[in-house]
Design a protein with these regions (language model features):
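Hydrophobic face of alpha-helices
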Residues: 28, 61, 152, 156-159
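Gly/Lys-enriched N-terminal cap/neck module of very large, oligomeric protein machines
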Residues: 120, 137, 142-152
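Accessory nucleic-acid engagement/destabilization modules that flank
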Residues: 139-142, 157, 161-162
Length: 162
């Protein structure tokens, strides 16, 4: 269950739980509760969701898109209980009627699909790389620096510099 959290006071959400405990589902709900809040459909550009693996990142993006699509086209007489439970949870947290949640989900889905490059669900490594690239000048790094994952290559280069 999502708690109603004042995002101005506490803008960070960290979930720590074991495998198979529903973390991804909970993170998707949390993401949707922020995305569908009154600030607008482009809010996704200012949300950063970080995972450990590429697989988890891809899964979370897929689940967010799938949830938005399911909510936007939701029909209580035809659709599954999972979408109904997501909508119910969002109604509790956001204090909105189903029709408004569906409308916002549709607008947000369109915005994300048209600006997918700003849909920030990534691994810790990718997030850090983006951060370092943003401040490469301040860190006295070349604008086009490269990351090497080959330890031996890096060690050899360091030893040559000594």
């Amino acid at each position: 269950m999502l708690a109603s959290i004042d995002r101005n006071t506490f803008p960070l959400c960290v979930l720590n739980a074991s495998a198979g405990s529903g973390k991804t589902f909970q993170l998707v709900l949390e993401y949707l509760s922020i995305l569908l809040a009154p600030e607008g459909s482009n809010k996704y550009k200012s949300i950063v969701a970080i995972t450990f693996t590429n697989k988890a990142s891809t899964e979370m993006k897929t689940r967010i898109i799938d949830a938005l699509f399911s909510i936007a086209k939701y029909n209580a007489t035809e659709d599954d209980a999972k979408t109904a439970s997501i909508i119910l949870e969002l109604q509790k947290v956001l204090g909105l009627k189903e029709a408004e949640i569906k409308k916002r989900a549709s607008k947000s889905l369109k915005a994300i699909l048209h600006g997918y490059e700003h849909f920030n669900v990534s691994t810790i490594d990718k997030f850090n790389l983006r951060l370092i690239k943003s401040f490469s000048n301040d860190l006295n790094l070349p604008a086009e620096f490269e990351i090497s994952l080959n330890e031996k290559e890096v060690l050899d280069e360091v030893l040559e510099l000594l």
